[in-house]
Amino acid sequence: MKLEPQGDSCKLSGRLTQEEVARLWKTRKTLLPDDARRLDLSELTYSDSAGMAFLMELVSLRKGELTLASPSPQVRKLIALYDLDAFFSTEGQTR
C-alpha cells in the first residue's frame, strides 16, 4: 500500500490488508497531513476487514471530517456489508 499526499487529499493505492494495517498502526495518528480532508481511494485495489477498520480509525481520528473519494466497487461493497454508509462520507466512485 502506498500513501501519497496531494494538497488537502491523500491518495491510497495498492492493497490495504491486515499485514499493511499491522505495519501502519503505530503511525496512524501522524500518517495523514494535518490539512488532509479527503482520502482518494481510486487506486486502492483491495481492502479486507482490517483495512476497513483502519479507514474507520483514520476517519475517527479526524472526528468524521475525512471523506473517502472514489472508492472501488469492492470497497463500496464492504461499506454496505458492514452497514457503514452512515459512518463514512463518500464521493464519486470507480468502476
Which residue ranges define each predicted feature?
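STAS-like cytosolic regulatory interaction modules
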Residues: 1-50, 57-95
